[in-house]
């Protein structure tokens, strides 16, 4: 049985509070069970040097964890003076997947910064950040369209992300930290509202997995992502 | 008149939500008007090297701002690779003032980390961090006493902090950002519940100030701090 | 047609020169077409702090590129003072996948460092590094067993890695840089000699992909990896 | 009694050697007892980015300590690769207080860099740096006026700084290191020649202090600063 | 007798493989006994800021060692986040000596980057880097002249470098690591093809040396450099 | 003619003020013409890790320049966060040459730190640092012997250093900055009181030099160093 009594194909309760940070162009506090992430979107009227004069925009993400988002206090990355490898990996993933559903030309020469700051961590912080980042992005785009900065909606599809894995030999949806840390196989999946894949990252943590395992996990992820997309679509 | 219609000796509305971060030993979300800070306290069973074998504890603070806590997105300090001068100054202030009301010997050979993370900034973030940090500290000490880690209460007095300043020639209590940025004189005061000073930091931003100005500002601060202490004492 | 005239399911020529760096415990110069990577394995008789007293070993990897491994000279990471996000991501991938085929307890309290330094880059440097890192690892383990440092072979299975992708609508095996940079979908696959998955990383670069696309790419990767494993098995 | 036999309201001997560094636009070696600081002023014909096109100048300060300015050799900050929190705090203080007596518009689009390097430290290095920095600044301004770079004198008032504190229950002026390290209350005061306050920084090191204590310390500081200003006015 | 049986005035076998890195403008794998260095030359069409608008070019060098170029694995400089003192010293030496034989005005406003990466180290890596860097530089200049980028040959003379030293009281040519680490006197000499000195760096490692010792070592170095220049001149 | 009217074989006026920094174990302010360096020696009762349990001591040096030691203000290395290549090179040189005249076993398990801080720079700062560092070292050793920390004098010989060079075709002794910056050949020589070489660093800045040039420069340096040694021997 799962630590919190869920069925293997059941998500943790989702709670989404939009407009959590008034200063931001778009923002959300997203909660999946005990995992809580503040996501903001910030529009900047310039693009990074490598996009200069290409008449298109950019979306980039940064990810952080408050020192006491974890059961044992973590060292602050600003104090250590280095952004760690895991952080780099996660922020590249968030930026890349969000860019996949945005028409960067319609964005114009603008950068949208997505900041995902984990205030409590209980597994699945990177997938919650993608989902929350998407919601904040949509809010910021709406605001920019209302202000006439952007004329055509650059967002091509909705997206959401979830983790799946094999724990004690069972394929399970939406792993909490206790499951994640003992998973035999661990996978993060990002999909569009239209049911296609944006990103698959599957890792054999304890033993290699078969194609059959892979297909089971993909089905679980599809189910979970469909449910999250439904929640997003029903927000105000 | 003040930007938000307050009287010169009036605080902004205070809201304090304790136990905001479940993982922490003590935590609070403190709000003064639009300024919002998450404060956590974390107990670690060791002391920094310079206190080795002195049979006493330590309290240290770290302060950060989420990138979009401000109207214009700030660079993340972990990204710049350096903790800035202002951050250093603030975290030294928080740690020093909290240590002033704690009997470090009663704490035993432990460090309490106070993390203050600003999620929205509208002036007074350092004083809100001291007040919030104190509340989180008290919660953590209670928890440690309940667990039998600490036998005698090491907290000697309550403390709270507020900013005051001279704006457009008028002494004012609890400056919001719009006032702070045009203040002629700017002062941060930390006092105990018993009415004594822990820290006075007064700066002539535009013109030097007289002893009379100083005394007016101290009176305003005393009034504000008394009110905040009353709110803290009435929490659950 | 592919830039180098290959068929879509055809690997680039592989060349493997073992014992390329005499000082190392195991080493190889691996070439896939114009991609060339020096991989070394170094045995150190201690483990990282987090494994202290757990009676098991560790495998960790570092990855670098010579400044002129690329058509345009790159900034040296030692000069920039920071290991970049892409580098972090790759070295975490190499370490994780190699650990997946090693019984760390049989290794004893030792760390094996795998260093992968790209001397020429033409796509697929991370998968070549995994394959080359595996060969260097095997050499180092042999040497340690001959020296009596290790008594039982800790390597549980062989592994190899390859990239696949969709380019101009066609699923292709082993992308060179010209293909990789215009791929619609890009995937790195790591598999064992026994045909199971260690890692799947698939990314929609230009458009989301379907489950059918995924299955085609996995088949291509399986074919390529089987061929590489055969080459490895036939070395000396 | 005080360690060096002074009365509680007595300054240590002051020695000021102007033009100590020939290369600088203004320079001084200032000594207060055993505390010795080299201060230089350097005029640069540009302003920091945030002042661009505002038709005014800037004054900024940097502070350092030679490794053997202290009884036990300190680590060099260039070696540690980080400017510490205390250094940041002090250099911000020096810059801010000097700017308070300068009309930045009369300075024109120039930056004056004040460098304060402690060659021997025996308490009061930050206040000696402010006083010495002011003298170097005046020299540099004179030189710039003689050269016709600046037409109207931008310096509005003289300034000096001193530390005061409560030691063994007694309010004392100009603490040496032995006193500073055991002070119950510690205060740094910066005042103008016209008797007004530029900065007050008071800290309860051992116990909170009353308003009465504060007023005693302010009177001591006023007396000391008046004496220092007199010395400055009598130079050459 | 010498560890490898050479006579005191005998070089180790030299092997030079030009065009080792296809991507580079010029490249070489140079081997002196067991010391092996990859040198590349990269032409960039701009100059460093300090040469702006001076109508001349620049040559600069960077030096690195693969982590397992040494018998015991070294920490990667990118990982430590700092380029060490020895590396700085060597890359300044390489750049300075190569510039001494180049007419920077004939180069035009271009920078040539010389990268020297040691893949195996057995003494003399800095002198091998100078010799190899020179060969790569010549190749890059030829390529630039063929492409019409440069019209007149900027290279004024050939250069080569070698180490000499006093070991067990005997002056010896081309020290291997075992000799270098016990040398009483250690000297690196860079000379032109026309027999003049570019750089002499002699260090008393164990005891001070006389002018007579110096002259013996210079003669040995002259002999060795003449032989290396002959090898270079005979390359295809 | 030389900028300051000296003859080609004439030193600039030397001034040596011992015990300049009271806190240090040994200290000196050394001046050669307008070049002024504060050198201190600090004894620490431990050795670096690589000398652990070898029953011998170590001497290491650090070198810095005050920001306004130069005609145009330099960036502070602590601010840039990096110790530059030139600084690294110089401090390695100072440490190496001082170690050459000290019997490290007689020093016992101690480190002597030599800090050389340039307060005004007019050429020859590295050679002045070696000479000044030697004087500070001698003072510190005397103090340690008086205190009974060291029983036998570990200093085997005196040492001094000077720069020489070819300027406008003429060999000259003790170059000032104006000469150094236009020198055709530039050489730094370190010798013992007994007339032997510790270090020779000669660089062709504009054209390669002959053995005859070398011998002329060595003679000039010998003359200068003999004179400096005489000054040192005549101090109190």
UniProtKB/Swiss-Prot annotation, chains A, B, C, D, E, F:
It is an enzyme of class 2 (transferase). The lineage of its organism: Bacteria, Pseudomonadati, Nitrospirota, Thermodesulfovibrionia, Thermodesulfovibrionales. Belongs to the RNase PH family. GO terms for biological process: rRNA catabolic process; rRNA processing; tRNA processing. Homohexameric ring arranged as a trimer of dimers. The gene is rph. The keyword Transferase applies. Phosphate binds at residues 86, 124-126. Its EC number is 2.7.7.56. Keywords: Nucleotidyltransferase, RNA-binding, rRNA processing, Transferase, tRNA processing, tRNA-binding. It catalyses: tRNA(n+1) + phosphate = tRNA(n) + a ribonucleoside 5'-diphosphate. GO terms for molecular function: 3'-5'-RNA exonuclease activity; RNA binding; tRNA binding; tRNA nucleotidyltransferase activity. It comes from the Bacteria. It comes from Thermodesulfovibrio yellowstonii (strain ATCC 51303 / DSM 11347 / YP87). Phosphorolytic 3'-5' exoribonuclease that plays an important role in tRNA 3'-end maturation. Removes nucleotide residues following the 3'-CCA terminus of tRNAs; can also add nucleotides to the ends of RNA molecules by using nucleoside diphosphates as substrates, but this may not be physiologically important. Probably plays a role in initiation of 16S rRNA degradation (leading to ribosome degradation) during starvation. This is Ribonuclease PH.
